[in-house]
Amino acid sequence: FKFFQTTCFNIVYLFLIILQKISNRSIILRFKEFLEKKNYFDKNILNKKIYFFTPNELTKWRVDTILDKEPETIKWINSFKNNSIFWDIGANIGLYTIYAAKKKKKIKIYSFEPSTSNLRTLSRNVSINKLQKNVFIIPFALSNSKNKLLQLKEKQFTEGGALNAFGVKYDYSGKNFFVENSYNTFGTSIDDLIEKRILETPNYIKIDVDGIEDLILIGAKNMLSNKKIKSVLIEINDKFSIQKKKIFKIMKKNNFKVLSKNRNDFYYKNDFDGIYNYIFQKI
């Protein structure tokens, strides 16, 4: 059935290309949007219908598992105070951005996602849930350097994809990272954004970028001392011990203590069995 569905879609797509050459472009765009409506999915969360754009099986899976893949992240977001500022660094398609915006009143969210594969879906999810007043998408990478054009390596060019690397030659485990999918893009440091008053200091920060969490923290050494920051959730690979030590040293220096360490063992097996979400609380 899936082969039949794909074949039909390809035939329709070819028909659209031919029609586009001989017809009005606006008609084609409207028809294309009509076809894509089948990719919109609603899920009952927080006793509300929340909408998601799910153009493939991976994004559909991410939406299906939003509440049970990382329950510690959901619990952490539930603890946020109203009228707070949340930085979602490594937002992917925006699951936790959308959840936080729906859960908390008057929250302001800066959603960081440099992957061109994910930005299309992230922006749609914000738009279809009418969260433009609460959510601000930052479409570039963060690192320890200011204003650099560096290579972003994508594990796969697909919506909902992860395990990417910005400006480094290693992956989430510290091993050499070889991929064919890459392009140069802009990145800067957190301190640069704060010092230039481009963004506001957050109360809560989530960092899940699959490999350069330590570099992002190095680029935030001034901001991390700010008492406005209440807690930081960082995805850490315990098996990437050099990186883990750097992260703990930075957090301790800025008066953070480990509040919790959790993961759902069902989803983190084999290559991912060293990965945990650490929540650091300001002392």
Listing of model-derived features with the role each one plays in the protein:
Residues F1-K130, N134, K175-V179, V258-I283:
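S-adenosyl-L-methionine
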Residues L46-K75, Q132-K133, I138, S143-D192, ...:
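Glycine-rich adenosyl-binding loop in Rossmann-like folds that engage adenosine-containing cofactors
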Residues G90, A141, D208:
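Active-site glycine-centered loops adjacent to acidic/histidine catalytic or metal-binding residues
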Residues A100, L122, V135, L150-L152, ...:
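Hydrophobic packing residues within well-ordered alpha-helices of enzyme cores
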Residues K69-T73, I93, F186, I216, ...:
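Amphipathic coiled-coil/heptad-repeat helices and related helical stalk/stem segments
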Residues Y40, N83, K104-S111, N118, ...:
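Conserved acidic-Pro-Pro-aromatic motif
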